[in-house]
Amino acid sequence: MIRSELIQKIADENPHLYQRDVERIVNTVFEEVTNAMSRGDRVELRGFGAFSVKKRDARVGRNPRTGETVHVEEKHVPFFKTGKLLRDRLNGKEE
């Protein structure tokens, strides 16, 4: 599912809301999650999961094509840990 499909689905299930308002809400949610994570904050959505930022240390890597060793800089990467309700639903354990 892509962002436009999510917006359409929410708008279809909430006919009292205009699609442009739903789009604004969805965009705001994504923007706030992005802002929080860029500050290093953890974003937890109970039952769904938690978004956080993990630090990957600098390391020596290898170019798979040439075999040459290369220095890989330290970086921060997004991390998502699923919540129990989401995990259960994915594994067919719906309540």
Swiss-Prot record:
GO cellular component entries: chromosome; cytosol
SUPFAM superfamilies referenced in this protein's UniProt entry, alphabetically: IHF-like DNA-binding proteins
Keyword Zinc-finger carried by entry: no
S-S bonds: none
CDD domains: IHF_B
Any GO MF annotation of the entry: structural constituent of chromatin
Gene Ontology biological process terms from the UniProt entry: DNA recombination; regulation of DNA-templated transcription; regulation of translation
Claim: Transcription regulation is one of the keywords in the record: yes
Recorded superkingdom: Bacteria
Keywords, comma-separated and alphabetical: DNA recombination, DNA-binding, Transcription, Transcription regulation, Translation regulation
HAMAP family hit by this protein: IHF_beta
Biological role stated in the UniProt entry: This protein is one of the two subunits of integration host factor, a specific DNA-binding protein that functions in genetic recombination as well as in transcriptional and translational control.
Family designation: Belongs to the bacterial histone-like protein family.
Complex formation: Heterodimer of an alpha and a beta chain.
Protein name: Integration host factor subunit beta
Gene designation: ihfB
